[in-house]
């Protein structure tokens, strides 16, 4: 049976494994990652100490993107010692009936990781259509020396040449600068906000892609019409002409956090060349 994967944080119980009976050791998360990543791409590995009533030891929550990969890992690892002296217990997580978890879109780094795994490094490409400074349109009366807001708007196109699929996404990055008169602080904030806008736009573009993983391991791609936005019907010229945020028909979506602190001034803008305005 085929499995459909979205560029979203895995939230299904079938994609999540509970591992207990772990012996506390240095590098436990790394050991778990090394073992379970052999069965498929992992979203996360989290280790926690047992509750006091459960006695000493640890347990782990491991999230796969694919439920099929999680199932194979559970059957292969349950009852095995793996990297410790005592056997581990591994089961697929279950949730209480009626429990609903918010499903977040993957951030741009995770989107690229998922695309590289299933499509290959050369199986997709992206380009920036426009990256515009839209700061100040809502802050015309800002006082000199006071906190200033930096905003950048970005539109990105993702192309999957082997599947004939092309999608676009739009993202808005913004941050406040405590001292708008400090050129170094303002320049640093500007580059980080640019990267944030590019990352959000890339994630938005990937939301329109569905990966269909067949039993044979081959991957097909479908366009996710449910994720379409008003901006998808605009021409590139119209996208490049979007300047005022108040005129931007952005559809908000719940996005896994793009962490500004992870973006340093020394980094180049992610992967793509920024068009000159």
UniProtKB/Swiss-Prot annotation:
Q: Any one Gene Ontology biological process term? A: DNA recombination
Gene Ontology MF term list: DNA binding; RNA binding
Q: What is the documented function of this protein?
A: Confers resistance to the antitumor agent cisplatin. Binds preferentially to sites of DNA modified by cisplatin in vitro. Binds to double-stranded DNA in a cooperative manner resulting in the formation of filament-like structures. Binds to single-stranded DNA with no cooperativity. Binds to RNA.
Source taxon at top rank: Eukaryota
- Compartments reported by the entry: Nucleus; Cytoplasm; Nucleus, Nucleolus
Enumerate the transmembrane spans: none
User: SMART domains from the xrefs?
Assistant: RRM
Residue ranges constituting the RRM domain according to the UniProt record: 15-95
Please state what the protein is called: RAD52 motif-containing protein 1
Q: Please list the coiled coil stretches.
A: none
UniProtKB keywords: Cytoplasm, DNA-binding, Nucleus, RNA-binding
One GO cellular component term of this record is: cytoplasm
Q: Which InterPro entries match?
A: Nucleotide-bd_a/b_plait_sf (IPR012677), Rad52_fam (IPR041247), Rad52_Rad59_Rad22_sf (IPR042525), RBD_domain_sf (IPR035979), RDM1 (IPR040224), RDM1_RRM (IPR034200), RRM_dom (IPR000504)
Q: Which gene encodes it?
A: RDM1
Q: How does it assemble?
A: Homodimer.
Q: Which residues form the signal peptide?
A: none
Pfam families, A to Z: Rad52_Rad22, RRM_1
């Amino acid at each position: 049976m085929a499995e459909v994967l979205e560029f979203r944080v895995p939230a299904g119980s079938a994609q999540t494994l509970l591992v207990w009976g772990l012996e506390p050791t240095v590098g436990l998360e790394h050991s778990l990652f090394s073992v379970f990543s052999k069965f498929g791409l992992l979203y996360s590995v989290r280790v926690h100490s047992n509750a006091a009533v459960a006695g000493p030891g640890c347990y782990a929550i491991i999230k796969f993107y694919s439920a099929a990969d999680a199932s194979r890992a559970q059957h292969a690892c349950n009852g095995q010692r793996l990297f410790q002296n005592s056997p581990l217990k591994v089961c697929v997580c279950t949730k209480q009936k009626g429990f609903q978890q918010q499903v977040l879109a993957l951030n741009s780094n995770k989107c690229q990781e998922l695309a590289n795994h299933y499509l290959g490094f050369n199986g997709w490409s992206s380009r920036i259509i426009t990256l515009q400074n839209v700061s100040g349109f809502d802050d015309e009366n800002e006082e000199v020396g006071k906190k200033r807001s930096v905003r950048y708007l970005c539109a990105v196109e993702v192309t999957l040449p082997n599947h004939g699929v092309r999608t676009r996404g739009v993202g808005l990055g913004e941050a406040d600068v405590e001292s708008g008169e400090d050129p170094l602080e303002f320049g640093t904030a500007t580059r980080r906000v640019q990267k944030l806008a590019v990352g959000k736009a890339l994630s938005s573009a990937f939301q329109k892609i569905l990966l269909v993983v067949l039993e044979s391991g081959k991957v097909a791609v479908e366009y996710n019409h449910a994720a379409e936005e008003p901006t998808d019907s605009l021409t590139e010229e119209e996208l490049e002409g979007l300047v005022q945020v108040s005129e931007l028909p952005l559809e908000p979506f719940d996005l896994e956090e793009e962490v500004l602190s992870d973006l340093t001034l020394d980094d180049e803008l992610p992967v793509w060349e920024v068009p000159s305005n």
